[in-house]
């Protein structure tokens, strides 16, 4: 924070030029003693209202460079005549953001083309626009242009005028403004009413946006003389906000009736969006309104007939070519909506769909229909002779195509007359089977308005349906009637798993065999193309299980502690408390600390990270201000001061020494920055960071108390009384009183957690899960330990070739988990190795010294072997046993070159040896 001495020094460096201005309506300054000016001199800079400047970003790695600054335009300059800690000479600015600071999903629109090296974007997010003049690095130049002109062209256009300047130059063509409930990139030539207001536009404003699109032109076009003469008598109207994706817009149906030109159709992201034409005269209020897609009104433009027709062909062909196959057999699909109106003075409601398919694709798609439902107009050009020859049809009857052949005998013997029974009010073609060569399929989709408007009730088209099974054909054999004979030409035959067509609907009659399962990417492509429609059952079902894995293997994978569960059972109250704390701090953009404690395995880290994921998802949906998330774990640090290095690396991506990282973090969290977002820091295993000086923990808990930091720290430790037992008083006071304790899980909660992980699998019996839950809850309540025991039980059951885990398997796993690893290693040793360990323990007990020699141990080996009736080993074999136990780290021994005088030391306790080598187990 700037102290008073620095504030006075900065104020003395600023020299105001001109007289004081009237008080403009600036928020937060209405009740303060301030004087506004138009111009000033600050050091070597001469600043005026309207100048573009570079403001140093305190959060950047190099704030004294162009890349470490933010671009802004000065709106007001004022001097604060009150004694505060802030700098008195300040400015109100309009921010401009670098393209990398805008979410990447905002660039998905095909009409947005950003040059990341030259452009800046006018920012309308609620950043603090009050900056000190001392933070200004230098002046710059921002050239505003239209979205139809590239950034390089704008720079070249002003190159001659700006040759002498050495200021950095940028181009601005878009603004990032809030429309309805989300932020969007809007070209500068589009002026919106109250861009940051969430209120819905009125119907008149929507009509103004629809009816007066022609006034949405470039900035250069506004200064054109001809455009100025034409528009001198027309009053400028402010544009309404663009329609959001969640809202419902209304358009007049009469615009479809009176429009007699081709409207371009653009396919965006697999969805077909009809670009509607507007009426040239202002629309009247009509009760006959239909809801339309927001994208429809967004893409609406007023164009000349020639440019509109060319745009239709260009947009449609580009959209189709992007998703088409690169092979020679790819579809050639083109369609548009035209009116069958020979005289433009006599409008008609009859509309037709003009469709052009490749001959090869047409012969496959329309083979099962006697008359194609999408008949061409008489003026459509007929296919060439070669295409007619390939189709086997006569001139003027290009859609009477022969039916397909099938290798099933029933299809060649009987065919049904086409009697469509079910009709739909759409021109949506059903997905057909793929060609053998792999020709991609594509369906035709139009909006509901066009579907209901294009065809009258007596012109509704039936959709071809697939053939039914053999059983249906045999049961309904008496309903068949002979079909009209049609001249057939040789077509490509395919193997079929079904039989002839039914009498009710026109069908393909040919269904391919079961294909290989589709990958998720292929499935999503088909859903976007409209060939598949996602159902609720498909979204809720679990992913397909791998047939090569058994049920026990799948259960073992789900029981692993590293698997992230879909939900956190039994921690709903703790989740809500952490969520409320973090959400409030992010909303208020202030700092704070929270201490989370609990025994290991109680879900502390999982609950906090689950809250963070929820908050990040809300921030992406613009329901919460953006924030940064950092995470450090004391177990992953070589020493406590490395926490500074990890935090700075996550903030900037650079690795520096801990001294430099500490200095830079101290500067960052104590220096105010107007565009700084809230930072959430998760410190796991806080007790490991507690060194003797406790400086690391003190700094991590002291930074959130700074008003300029906007830092929220969530600390996690296993000890409930860590602040009072280990931390000093000044550290404990900064930790605050916001504490949350995770209690150990009860047996019912552990049983619920294990059952949720199994996900309805029948690999565990209920009493087996209950036994694990009760055993673990009685000892520690550690959910990780319960999952490990269940996982080990599945391994034991899998080894025994059993498909279900019983209580015997759980008891065996419990016995292994309760015993230590050293005890397990001793039990798995050979008989002579166990005798050697027993001899070492006996020699240590006899001498009272933990360190002994091989000679004394060998004497004990001879005695124990004679007592147990075992042939005692020779000294050479005993030396080999000593070396093997030393390699297993059960004992610590010198090099074997010392022979009988090498020193031996037990690496396990004598109690572990006696526990592992009980007399009854040795006898057995």
Curated annotation (Swiss-Prot):
Residues 211-227 have a biased composition (Basic and acidic residues). This is Origin recognition complex subunit 1. ATP binds at residues 564, 598-606, 685, 718, 784. Its main location: nucleus. Component of the origin recognition complex (ORC) that binds origins of replication. DNA-binding is ATP-dependent, however specific DNA sequences that define origins of replication have not been identified so far. ORC is required to assemble the pre-replication complex necessary to initiate DNA replication. Mg(2+) binds at residues 684-685. Belongs to the ORC1 family. One of its GO terms (biological process) is DNA replication initiation. It is found in: Nucleus. The modification Phosphoserine is found at residues 293, 368, 426, 430, 533. SMART domains: AAA, BAH, Cdc6_C. The modification Phosphothreonine is found at residue 419. Disulfide bonds: none annotated. Keywords: ATP-binding, DNA replication, DNA-binding, Magnesium, Metal-binding, Nucleotide-binding, Nucleus, Phosphoprotein. It comes from the Eukaryota. The keyword Nucleus applies. Residues 496-516 have a biased composition (Low complexity). The gene is Orc1. One of its GO terms (molecular function) is DNA replication origin binding. Residues 196-239, 377-440, 460-523 are annotated as: Disordered. ORC is composed of six subunits. The lineage of its organism: Eukaryota, Metazoa, Ecdysozoa, Arthropoda, Hexapoda.
